[in-house]
């Protein structure tokens, strides 16, 4: 049984450990873009065990974060309590999440490449809809190079990112940073080793 055949069961099993499988520190690309965060609020999309949502709260933002795994949300709540941060956690998949139109000043999606192309287009549209004009969008994902490294991600070509995809999906944004690169990452036990990466930071017009 693969993660794509039974995703909720797969992820609940992966998160059923006291260990934070993606670590407790924020994603390195997200951290590098801190200067571009807008004051106010943030939405962390498919935030897993909460490392990025908690870090966003530590930057003084009012944070909503969701993930469909109950085990992940429980661990995220514990992480926030330990770091003395307030985050509004929602146990929900992206289709059922209560997306609020033009609500957030920042929307962040880190390694959420479970979505096939048609589903991804709809998810990107929801992220765009929820971001205020002038707000910041930050995305980190894997490129086709990741298929040879096999150090994380879905391992499916159709799920990989590239720069033309991002420029087309967010054509109404001003691109602040868009790069594809290879780097050594060390995010818990699940993301470790040389990786093919894409980072996008953009401002909604």
Region spans (language model):
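Conserved beta-strand signature within the Rossmann-like core of class I S-adenosyl-L-methionine
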Residues: 134-142
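A short acidic, Gly/Pro-enriched loop at the edge of an enzyme's catalytic core
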Residues: 95-106
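Short alpha-helix
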Residues: 158-179
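Conserved class I S-adenosyl-L-methionine
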Residues: 1-37, 39-48
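Conserved SAM-binding strand-loop segment of SAM-dependent methyltransferases
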Residues: 83-96
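Conserved SAM/SAH-binding beta-strand->alpha-helix loop
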Residues: 69-71
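A short, conserved alpha-helix within the catalytic core of class I
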Residues: 114-127
């Amino acid at each position: 049984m693969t993660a794509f055949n039974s995703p909720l069961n797969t992820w609940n099993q992966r998160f059923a450990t006291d260990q934070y499988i993606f670590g407790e520190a924020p994603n390195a690309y997200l951290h590098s873009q801190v200067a571009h965060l807008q004051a106010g609020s943030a939405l962390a999309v498919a935030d897993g065990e909460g490392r990025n949502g908690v870090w966003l709260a530590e930057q003084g933002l009012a944070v909503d974060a969701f993930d469909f795994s109950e085990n992940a949300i429980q661990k995220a709540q514990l992480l926030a309590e330990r770091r003395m941060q307030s985050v509004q956690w929602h146990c929900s998949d992206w289709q059922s999440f209560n997306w609020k139109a033009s609500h957030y000043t920042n929307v962040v999606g880190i390694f959420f490449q479970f979505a096939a192309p048609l589903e991804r287009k709809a998810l990107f549209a929801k992220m765009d809809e929820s971001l205020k004009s002038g707000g910041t969008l930050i995305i980190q994902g894997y490129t086709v190079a990741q298929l040879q490294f096999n150090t994380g991600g879905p391992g499916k070509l159709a799920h990989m990112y590239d720069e033309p995809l991002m420029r087309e999906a967010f054509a109404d944004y001003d691109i602040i940073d868009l790069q594809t690169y290879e780097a050594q990452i060390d995010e818990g036990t699940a993301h470790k080793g040389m990786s093919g990466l894409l980072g996008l930071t953009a401002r909604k017009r």
